[in-house]
Design a protein with these regions (language model features):
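A short helix->loop->beta-strand "cap" motif at the edges of active sites that frequently abuts
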Residues: 58-64, 83-85, 163, 222-224, ...
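NAD(P)-binding Rossmann-fold cofactor-contacting core
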Residues: 160-178
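Glycine-rich NAD(P)-binding loop of Rossmann-like domains
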Residues: 116-153
Length: 313
């Protein structure tokens, strides 16, 4: 029996893996495509670009790309599908990402970054009122763009803050609406004009790239808060910087960036923007769940079982 071979795009701690009683050989990719000889599975992360050229360079023996993360916009799905390669993801990050989204909602609304900077600089020298006054989050209208697992998890948290939840997406979700007392808006602009706080939780596609741009930003309330824990390229960052410098929007909270780890310098200069280095899934428990999900898909491929989280092409 041929020994099963797994190629890793980056070094990740894995337990000893066996498929059908055979130990899986794990190879670390470092630019040499000859390492793929005899390989059946490639394991990648959201930080690894698996484009059409990369897919063309790997042998036909590769039948699965097991991507670690919910998003898979780093992979050329068309090229993979045409080559007969299946894609799996790890959709186990919803609750942790929703936690971070709500952290950014509260931190941004209450101007935490500006107030922390004020304190750390030693300017808090008396019982004077806070220099940077925030806005109330509870009881406001929260607009969610993308009402999948993560968007709905954000909505569940919002109900605890007595928020009015509205959402926009490519299709209505009546069951989720009823469960979460949420209202669907067919047009993005109408939802943006209604929301006090906007949370981006949709996937990055050709249709959603720069879904927040100069035009849609102008549709938002002038004192609105914008939060993004989806993908950085959902926002035209230059347009966001221009809008905030013009006093449009009271605050923003961003965990993801279009060209991360590079960040638009204008964002770094704004005290009313709370920034995080893509930590939506950065908890020990979530990392463990991601690894377990990826491993289960990898073993399923080697053992001829059904994949647990196969992505539709």
């Amino acid at each position: 029996m041929t020994r099963p071979v797994l190629v890793m795009m980056r070094p990740l701690p894995l337990p000893l893996l066996r498929a059908n009683g055979e130990e899986i050989e794990v190879r670390q990719f470092q630019g040499d495509f000859s390492l793929f000889e005899g390989a059946t599975v490639l394991c990648s992360t959201a930080l690894d670009r698996v484009d059409a050229d990369f897919i063309a360079a790997i042998p036909d023996s590769v039948k699965l790309i097991a991507n670690m993360g919910t998003g898979y916009d780093n992979i050329d799905l068309v090229a993979a599908t045409e080559k007969g390669i299946k894609i799996t993801n790890t959709p186990v990050v919803a609750e942790d990402t929703a936690d971070l989204a709500f952290l950014l909602i509260l931190a941004s609304a209450r101007q935490l970054t500006a107030n922390q900077k004020f304190l750390r600089a030693g300017h808090w020298t008396s019982t004077q009122p806070a220099t940077h006054i925030g806005k109330t989050a509870h009881g406001t209208t929260l607009g969610i763009v993308g009402f999948g697992q993560i968007g709905q998890a954000v909505a569940r948290r919002a109900k605890g803050f007595n928020m009015n939840v509205i959402y926009h997406g490519p299709r209505r979700k009546p069951a989720a609406e009823k469960l979460l007392d949420a209202t669907y808006f067919e047009t993005l602009e109408e939802m943006l004009a209604t929301a006090d706080i906007v949370s981006l939780n949709c996937a990055l596609t050709a249709q959603t790239k720069h879904i927040i741009n100069a035009q849609t930003l102008s549709a938002m309330k002038s004192d609105a808060v914008l939060v993004n824990t989806g993908r950085g390229a959902l926002i035209d960052e230059a347009a966001l910087v221009d809008a905030m410098n013009a006093g449009h929007l009271s605050a923003a909270g961003l965990d993801v960036f279009e060209y991360e780890p590079d960040i638009h310098p204008g964002l770094l200069e704004l005290d009313n923007v709370t920034l995080a280095p893509h930590i939506g899934a950065a908890t020990a428990q979530c990392h463990e769940a991601i690894g377990a999900c990826a491993i289960e898909n990898i073993l399923a491929q080697f053992e001829g079982r059904e994949l647990i989280s196969c992505v539709d092409p």
